[in-house]
């Protein structure tokens, strides 16, 4: 029997209906909601006269060609010599060849903005525009830089002028978005809503962001405030990772004095940013009314007994997986857990040997004893049957039986995903000074189907699942080798190895795992990510019609405008659900400052400078400059945490800072795809499988340089 509780992720629950009706399911209904908000607010906007067709939505006119001189210089940016790259470009700003000088000034404008040199950025982009006044991308960039500098009227005029240079969707849509933001930041919410309405009805790639902005505008205007939740629901239905939409929704339900929902949404935010004192205070304040039942309002799976019961084991390489790890991959100190076995089980102490046996489906409890710093093994009546300060093992006597770990208690209900989990193999209990940790020692082949289960929402085709199984098997083998001397090889919250229990597996996953065992990757860093555009970390893929993309700071911004090609392998089935491929978020600078302050107080944010890139421009390092200091990191995951509390989809993005005076007030992030862009793209694999490619062909496509071993014959390709 399963007990489902409220999700601790960005999905709005049915109880929100008391605040607003469920978000509309089609663009037609969505548009009527926009019109209603516009009318309620006396806004003068009209729906776009014509709907965009598929050809227009997937056509790209963007040209990534660079003059040879500039192409050579920007390679210094990739190598991490961002300052040398900047000053080398300056040698070409007055080059007699207009093609070279305009390109140099364009790159310098973008790099200057990243360095917080706003007035210089304006000067450079105006110089680029004067050198090449017919280039629509230069004109568009000019509008965005003026907007960043707070020159709202000039920005709107520039965006309007762009429409005389081009009618191409990629440029026009970005210009309309810039115009809407210029109206909003200048305080004219009616005009902003009207401009956002145009984008809302014409650009399916921006629905989530525009819905959020319409919700934000509605929340700030009394006549339409009651409609704000509808737009926020729509925003989250199109992109569940839109952190600002959740933050705004939390404030709205708080104003409505709905303590339960306020706790739920603040708990969602706090689970992502657990060092945030303001969020901690909100969670504590509204949690008081829920008492000990607060955990029941989180999305934790509860199982009364094992679901699988029996599953034949496949002897293979053993993997030690630490359970209940947090986002930093640290296994949490547990205080109490219950468990049962689907067959007779035994407890073995590392020194005493076998100390206890217990029958199937009998609940037992492991509880930390703060006096002894050990753990007590108790029966259903609370009587201690065994105590230990040393690690001990729990294992079903028959290898095809399973163990269920349930009702987990940790120091904080937000410390990790505390869902119940059914396991294969052995459960190792490790007492510590402050609790105990759990490690699952399991065969790799028994683990792989459960790892596949966490990805079935992304991929459903058998060939794609088989390809992912190959990647997982190879990655597990690498992890075992690399961490052979450690107490565990992986955690259950690793980005590559999300584990929610064997209770989620089904026949197709077992078959995919078995079939895929015929080959294995060697000498490659096997990995995967959920969804993809055409520019991966160091390759151009996922389409038959590959763009001539080359890296430069300007080309990254240009690519963020680009339409996905019609034949994109990762193309979603629902034409309104593009957020996993293209996304836009707007973050308050004060939130970014507060997360940096966990490590170092740099004061108010002055500049956000990418410092290291992958060959194609994914951000691998970033410098944050403030009024009191500078903080720098070369960890993409930390970058995404600082900017978005870890809710951003990938490290492939550009940034438009919006200044108020000399410091940044808001940060607009425009991004593509998910993850780090390395290895197997799950949605891309699904697309290739639909074209008839088998799992071997998919593996060869995404790992063209890998050595593939045939596990049956031992031959290597």
Feature-to-residue mapping (PLM):
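Positively charged n-region of N-terminal signal peptides that target proteins for export
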Residues: 1-4
């Amino acid at each position: 029997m399963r007990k489902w509780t409220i999700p601790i992720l960005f999905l709005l629950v049915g109880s929100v209906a008391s605040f607003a009706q469920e978000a509309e399911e089609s663009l037609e209904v969505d548009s009527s909601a926009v019109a209603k908000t516009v009318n309620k607010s006396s806004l003068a906007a009209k729906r776009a006269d014509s709907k965009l067709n598929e050809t227009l939505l997937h056509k790209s006119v963007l040209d990534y060609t660079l003059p040879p001189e500039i192409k050579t210089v920007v390679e210094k940016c990739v190598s991490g010599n961002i300052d040398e790259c900047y000053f080398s470009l300056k040698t070409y700003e007055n080059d007699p060849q207009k093609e070279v000088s305009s390109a140099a000034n364009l790159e310098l404008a973008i790099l200057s903005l990243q360095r917080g040199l706003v007035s210089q950025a304006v000067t450079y982009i105006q110089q680029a525009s004067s050198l090449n006044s017919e280039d629509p991308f230069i004109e568009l960039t000019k509008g965005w830089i003026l907007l960043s500098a707070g020159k709202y009227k000039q920005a709107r005029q520039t965006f309007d002028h762009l429409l005389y240079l081009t009618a191409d969707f990629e440029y026009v849509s970005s210009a309309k978005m810039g115009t809407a933001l210029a109206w909003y930041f200048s305080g004219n919410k009616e005009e902003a809503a009207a401009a956002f309405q145009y984008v809302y009805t014409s650009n399916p790639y921006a629905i989530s962001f525009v819905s959020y902005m319409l919700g934000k505008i509605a929340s700030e205007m009394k006549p339409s405030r009651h409609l704000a939740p509808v737009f926020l629901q729509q925003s989250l239905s199109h992109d569940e990772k839109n952190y600002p939409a959740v933050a705004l929704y939390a404030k709205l339900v708080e104003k409505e004095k709905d303590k339960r929902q306020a706790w739920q949404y603040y708990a969602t935010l706090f689970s992502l940013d657990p060092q945030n004192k303001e969020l901690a205070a909100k969670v504590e304040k509204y949690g008081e009314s829920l008492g000990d039942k607060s955990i029941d309002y989180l999305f934790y799976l509860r199982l009364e007994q094992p679901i699988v019961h029996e599953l034949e084991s496949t002897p293979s390489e053993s993997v030690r997986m630490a359970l209940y790890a947090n986002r930093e991959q640290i296994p949490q100190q547990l205080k109490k857990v219950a468990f049962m076995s689907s067959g007779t089980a035994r407890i073995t102490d590392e020194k005493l040997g076998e100390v206890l046996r217990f029958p199937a489906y009998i609940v037992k409890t492991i509880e930390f004893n703060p006096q002894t710093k050990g753990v007590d093994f108790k029966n259903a009546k609370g009587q201690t049957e065994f105590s230990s300060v040393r690690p001990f093992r729990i294992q079903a006597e028959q290898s095809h039986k399973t163990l269920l770990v349930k009702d987990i208690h940790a120091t904080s209900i937000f410390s990790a995903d505390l869902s119940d989990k059914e396991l294969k193999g052995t459960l190792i209990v490790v007492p510590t000074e402050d609790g105990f940790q759990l490690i699952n020692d399991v065969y790799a082949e028994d683990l792989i189907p459960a790892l596949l289960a966490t990805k079935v929402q992304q991929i459903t085709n058998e060939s794609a699942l088989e390809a992912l199984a190959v990647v997982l098997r190879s990655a597990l083998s690498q992890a075992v080798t690399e961490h052979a001397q450690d107490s565990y090889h992986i955690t259950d919250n690793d980005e590559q190895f999300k584990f929610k229990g064997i209770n989620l597996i089904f026949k197709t996953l077992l078959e995919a795992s078995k079939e895929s065992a015929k080959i294995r990757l060697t000498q490659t860093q096997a990995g995967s990510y959920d969804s993809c555009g055409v520019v991966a970390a160091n390759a151009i893929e996922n389409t038959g019609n590959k763009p001539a993309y080359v890296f430069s700071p300007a080309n990254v911004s240009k690519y963020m405008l680009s339409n996905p090609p019609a034949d994109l392998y990762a193309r979603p089935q629902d034409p309104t659900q593009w957020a996993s491929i293209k996304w836009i978020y707007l973050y308050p600078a004060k939130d970014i400052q507060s997360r940096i302050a966990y490590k170092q107080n740099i004061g108010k944010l002055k500049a956000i400078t990418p410092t290291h890139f992958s060959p194609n421009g994914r951000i691998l390092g970033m410098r944050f400059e403030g009024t009191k200091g500078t903080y720098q990191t070369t960890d993409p995951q930390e970058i995404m945490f600082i900017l978005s509390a870890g809710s951003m989809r990938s490290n492939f993005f550009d940034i438009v800072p919006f200044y108020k005076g000399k410091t940044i007030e808001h940060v607009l992030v425009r991004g593509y795809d998910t993850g780090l862009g390395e290895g197997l793209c799950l949605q891309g694999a699904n697309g290739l499988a639909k074209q008839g490619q088998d799992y071997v062909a998919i593996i060869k496509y995404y790992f063209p340089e890998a050595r593939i071993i045939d596990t049956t014959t031992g031959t290597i390709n």
